[in-house]
Amino acid sequence: MSNIRQEMPVLARHEGDWIGTYTLVDLEGKILDKHESHLSCQFPDNSLDSYYQINRYKWSDGKQEEHKFPGMYRDKTLWFDTERIQGKAWEVDNSTLILWFSYKTAPAMYLYEMIQISPDNNHRARTWQWFKNHQIYQRTLIQEQRLS
């Protein structure tokens, strides 16, 4: 049995809670949406190959959302297949993860996310590039700091 923590050490550095801000912009940089986030990245004790992430979002108008993303590790890749998304994440160097996913309700749309973690493991910078029919149409910029 392979161990996700050993074979994806950059991903393992993300374990814990993160707070930050998501800023959605159009191609000209105009802000379309902005909200606060609290993400929990977990490696459940009952399996060497499991990953579990909870994303909580809060907008200034009081709107809130929570989404759960269980993942399974295989071949140095983290795979997601939930009722909402399908996708995969992999490491590209000692501080960078790439995530590709698509929403099951919008098959012509997908995104690539680049996730950078700081050397001290306390800050993350993330960028989503959104594509529809293989053409970029918006970006999400995310800045986070470790809560725990």
PLM feature segments, named:
Residues 32-112:
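Central antiparallel beta-sheet cores of small beta-barrel/beta-sandwich binding domains
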Residues 19, 98, 123-125:
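General beta-strand recognition
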Residues 1-68, 132, 136-148:
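Amphipathic/hydrophobic helical signal segments and adjacent flexible N-terminal regions
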Residues 103, 107-148:
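Glycine-rich, aromatic-bearing surface loops/beta-hairpins
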Residues 11-13, 92, 119:
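Surface-exposed coil/turn segments at beta-strand junctions on protein surfaces, enriched
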Residues 3, 24-26, 82-84, 100-102, ...:
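Sparse, context-dependent recognition of short Cys/His-centered cofactor- or disulfide-binding micro-motifs
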